[in-house]
């Protein structure tokens, strides 16, 4: 039976121009690969800008400064922190995209951006589509604290009191739309307790209000509260993590205290524009994980209540996706209007 070639001419001898074209393509392929390899091998060959969507001194800023310092030592190029606070991280991440996808502009991404994805009506970017995750840098939990002279000795005590007298106890947190604020909403949702939620602009304002006796329970991170806790002016009823904090071994988690659905783990990591070369992302991931494993960085992070621990890019993407879904549910259930 005769072979038939539908829509295709039988193969025949190569014409000279075809041979020249194939040779040119082969040379081009051989030429591109070393350039890409060299770019990854030489990266970084100049300072790297790391955009942080928070002001100086907060947990997000402190995490990135620890990491940037160690990365600068390792690769012999400066990782320069550029703080761009405001607008739920929009300003910082827009700067990253504007700077280009060459690996020399990176952004801090974490639970804050997961919240922004559901809190804002329209963002100038999609954090999952327009960025490629590199690695998580640190995890951190919330502390649920009361004044040092509070009559409440356990989380169960204060929840039961809030149920007996709805709206009578004040629950303090910072910034509407912040992880702390939404964690307070989630706490009421999973416990059924009815607190009056009082919002403050900054952690120092929150602390001042608590020390004045204006609020009965506060939600914030370890780094923000620990000095007042060490002085005895505040007392921790529980932490929000999966496991007990090694610095606070006598303090139960909310799960231990009888509220297994209340788990909040904040985190911050690094992302690059989506078009960044995979080899550059691979180099960054390896260097970040090496930096985070350094004993001196581990000790510095531990003193700030941070669990400094790297991940793969896919693990960071999975966590970001899960947190977007989690906080969207909290926002919708709380009836928080989109901005």
Locate each region found by the language model.
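Bacterial N-terminal signal peptides
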Residues: 20-33
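A ligand-binding cleft/hinge motif common to bilobed small-molecule-binding domains
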Residues: 112-122, 181, 188-190, 217-251
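Hinge/capping helix and adjacent helix->loop/strand transition within the periplasmic-binding protein
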Residues: 98-104, 118-205, 254, 267-300
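N-terminal (or domain-start) structured segment
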Residues: 39-129, 168, 189-217, 228, ...
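An extracytoplasmic/periplasmic, membrane-proximal ligand-sensing/linker region
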Residues: 45-47, 190, 256, 278-339
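N-terminal secretory signal peptides that target proteins for export/translocation
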Residues: 1-16
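Short beta-strand and adjacent tight-turn residues that come in two discontinuous sequence segments
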Residues: 108-109, 136, 200, 219-220, ...
């Amino acid at each position: 039976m005769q072979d038939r070639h539908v829509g295709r001419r039988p193969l025949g001898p190569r014409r000279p121009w075809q041979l020249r074209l194939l040779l040119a393509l082969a040379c081009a392929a051989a030429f591109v690969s070393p350039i890409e390899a060299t770019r990854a091998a030489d990266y970084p060959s100049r300072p790297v800008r790391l955009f942080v969507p928070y002001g100086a001194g907060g947990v997000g800023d402190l995490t990135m400064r620890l990491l940037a310092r160690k990365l600068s030592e390792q690769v012999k190029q400066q990782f320069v922190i550029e703080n761009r606070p405001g607008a739920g991280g929009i300003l910082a991440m827009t700067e990253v995209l504007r700077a280009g996808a060459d690996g020399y502009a990176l952004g801090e991404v974490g639970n804050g951006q997961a919240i922004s994805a559901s809190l804002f009506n329209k963002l100038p970017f999609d954090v999952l589509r327009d960025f490629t995750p590199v690695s998580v840098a640190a995890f951190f939990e919330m502390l649920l604290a009361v004044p040092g002279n509070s009559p409440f000795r356990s989380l169960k005590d204060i929840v039961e009191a809030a149920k007996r007298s709805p709206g009578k106890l004040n629950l303090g947190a910072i910034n509407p739309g912040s992880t702390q604020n939404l964690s307070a909403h989630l706490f009421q949702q999973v416990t059924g307790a009815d607190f009056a939620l009082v919002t403050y602009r900054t952690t120092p304002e929150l602390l001042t209000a608590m020390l004045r006796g204006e609020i009965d329970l506060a939600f914030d991170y370890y780094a923000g509260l620990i000095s007042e806790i060490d002085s005895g002016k505040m007392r921790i009823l529980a932490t929000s993590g999966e496991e007990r904090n090694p610095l606070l071994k006598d303090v139960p988690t909310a799960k231990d205290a009888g509220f297994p659905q209340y788990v909040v783990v904040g985190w911050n990591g690094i992302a690059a524009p989506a078009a960044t070369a995979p080899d550059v992302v691979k180099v960054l991931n390896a260097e970040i994980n090496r930096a985070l494993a350094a004993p001196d960085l581990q000790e510095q992070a531990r003193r700030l209540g941070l669990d400094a621990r790297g991940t793969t890019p896919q693990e960071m993407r999975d966590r970001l996706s899960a947190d977007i879904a989690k906080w969207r549910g909290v926002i919708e259930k709380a009836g928080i209007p989109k901005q």
